[in-house]
């Protein structure tokens, strides 16, 4: 992995040879650095003292550092499948992985009030909140994501799912910023999104002649792993943090010797993210060809060996989502994902098809993006449902009192604007009504011989159907606030050989895929509505 890929935002360079008054982190992060910079050198004691004295709290804390709110309104079962229109499966697969990111979705499902949203109708955070709420409260159904989600990204071609994923995360992060133009980098890194997905790399340079030390801290939202010579995620991580010798042309300029000097460079993690996104670099930046090789990844990963502070106990992450690309290059193919619902069952999310699966199938994929969450965070958010009330989907209990959108408040800047809530959800749900869906379905109905997702009339005796396909009777319009007569999920968890088809929707565009141009380095701009 190239070093430049680590610079995803502003960086703070703590050089032990000079005092940089412009480099300030918040007090909590400064405390971590006091204990992590323990190298012994002739200059380390004095410079470390100056460094710590110079640190100050951030100008503005955009989100509280205490634990994120929990939600007892989250159904424990799996949510809806997503309808595919054209080459938008890269959108669907990214949305599903974000929907089952517990700290994010539970925050959006909470009913806490906050300030007025400054982005109004073009707020990506509000649009995602409406989608996640709708998807999680529509188990057994197929919904169509709002076109607003990809308005600033989609070009009518097949795009890269990881690019869209990070585009969406970054857009939500920007939506969390208050309506002030002047904000320092440190304040921007205190948003809700950065607290969930973000942390810091510590790049430490040790000069071999004078024994000086220079540290640079770079924020990140995901970690790219070079798998060219790695057979597992563990090997890829070890290669990433392995000390590198810097000699000759690669020598670093020493602030004490005032010349280039041999040095060693080491990457470690001074802070840990609640959610860890690992992207496996499968595609060539030049040709777009895919590196189709099996890379082993575990369901649990201890990240303590890669932390700046050692011997502080295990830091266990658990796998909760896997994004998979099926194909031979980034220009074509198909995306699907595996996600773990809050009750612990794994599901394969392939556009409209939602199929129960097992951990063996999950771990045998040629993964493209891996999603891990700290074990303590998973347990905390999972227990919130059982503590409040029995996990359920919107159903019989809602007959007497339907859940209205006014009740689905969120701890986000647009919670006190009910008109915006109504508009966003109405806009999202209108795109999936029967009238909008039936006409293109009749015009573009796939021929039987090309229907690769055709469901046979006779099912094996060991298959348990959670809900029937909506295709034959037409897709109904389901809203989060409407009551639903939904079938309860069986408590029996099938094995990999007992996969369950939980719904299917025929492709509106057939199974052919358009080719995709190489947009790896193209810039994206967020849509702004007037």
Curated annotation (Swiss-Prot):
GO biological process: protein deubiquitination; regulation of apoptotic process; regulation of protein stability
Record keyword Lipid metabolism present: no
Compositionally biased tracts (Polar residues): 490-512
GO-annotated molecular function: cysteine-type deubiquitinase activity
Spans annotated as Disordered: 382-412, 431-454, 490-530
Nucleus is among the record's keywords: yes
Compositional bias of kind Basic residues: 513-524
Family statement drawn from the similarity comment of this UniProt entry: Belongs to the peptidase C19 family. USP17 subfamily.
Protein name: Inactive ubiquitin carboxyl-terminal hydrolase 17-like protein 7
């Amino acid at each position: 992995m190239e070093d430049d890929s680590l610079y995803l935002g502003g960086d703070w360079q703590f050089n032990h040879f000079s005092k940089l008054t412009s480099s300030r982190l918040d007090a909590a992060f400064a405390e971590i650095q006091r204990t992590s910079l323990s190298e012994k050198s002739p200059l380390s004691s004095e410079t470390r003292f100056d460094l710590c004295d110079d640190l100050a709290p951030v100008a503005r804390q955009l989100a509280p550092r205490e634990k994120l709110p929990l939600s007892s309104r989250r159904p424990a079962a799996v949510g809806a499948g997503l309808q595919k229109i054209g080459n938008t499966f890269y959108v669907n697969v990214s949305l599903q992985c974000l929907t089952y990111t517990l700290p994010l979705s539970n925050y959006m499902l909470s009913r806490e009030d906050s300030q007025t949203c400054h982005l109004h109708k073009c707020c990506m955070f509000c649009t995602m909140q409406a989608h996640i709420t709708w998807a999680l409260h529509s188990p057994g159904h197929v919904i169509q994501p709002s076109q607003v989600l990809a308005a600033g990204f989609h070009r009518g071609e097949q795009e890269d799912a990881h690019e869209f994923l990070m585009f969406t995360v970054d857009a939500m992060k920007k939506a969390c910023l208050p309506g002030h133009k002047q904000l320092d980098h440190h304040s921007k890194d205190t948003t809700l999104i950065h607290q969930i997905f973000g942390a810091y790399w510590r790049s430490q340079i040790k000069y071999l002649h004078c024994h000086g030390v220079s540290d640079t801290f770079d924020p990140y939202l995901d970690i790219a792993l070079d798998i060219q010579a790695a057979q597992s995620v563990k090997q890829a991580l070890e290669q990433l943090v392995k000390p590198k010798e810097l000699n000759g042309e690669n020598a670093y300029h020493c602030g004490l010797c005032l010349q280039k000097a041999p040095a060693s460079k080491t990457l470690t993690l001074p802070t840990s993210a609640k959610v860890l996104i690992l992207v496996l670099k499968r595609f060539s930046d030049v040709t777009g060809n895919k590196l189709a090789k099996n890379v082993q990844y575990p369901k649990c990963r201890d990240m303590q060996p890669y932390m700046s502070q050692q011997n502080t106990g295990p830091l266990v992450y658990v796998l909760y989502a896997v994004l998979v690309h099926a194909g031979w290059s980034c220009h074509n193919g198909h995306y699907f994902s595996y996600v773990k619902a809050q009750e612990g069952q794994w599901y394969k999310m392939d556009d409209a098809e939602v199929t129960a699966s097992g951990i063996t199938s999950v771990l045998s994929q040629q993964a493209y993006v891996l999603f891990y969450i700290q074990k303590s965070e998973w347990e905390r958010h999972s227990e919130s449902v059982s503590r409040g009330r029995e996990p359920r989907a919107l159903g019989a209990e809602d007959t007497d009192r339907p859940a209205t959108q006014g009740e689905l408040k969120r701890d986000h800047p647009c919670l006190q604007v009910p008109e915006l809530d109504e508009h966003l959800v109405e806009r999202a749900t209108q795109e999936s009504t029967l009238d909008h869906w039936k006409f293109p379905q009749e015009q573009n109905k796939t021929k039987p011989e090309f229907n690769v997702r055709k469901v046979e009339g006779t099912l094996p005796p060991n298959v348990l159907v959670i809900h029937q396909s909506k295709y034959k009777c037409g897709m109904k319009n389901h809203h989060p606030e409407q009551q639903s007569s939904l079938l309860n999920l069986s408590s029996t968890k099938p094995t990999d050989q007992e996969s369950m088809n939980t719904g299917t929707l025929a492709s509106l565009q057939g199974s052919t895929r358009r080719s995709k141009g190489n947009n790896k380095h193209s810039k994206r701009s967020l849509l702004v509505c007037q």
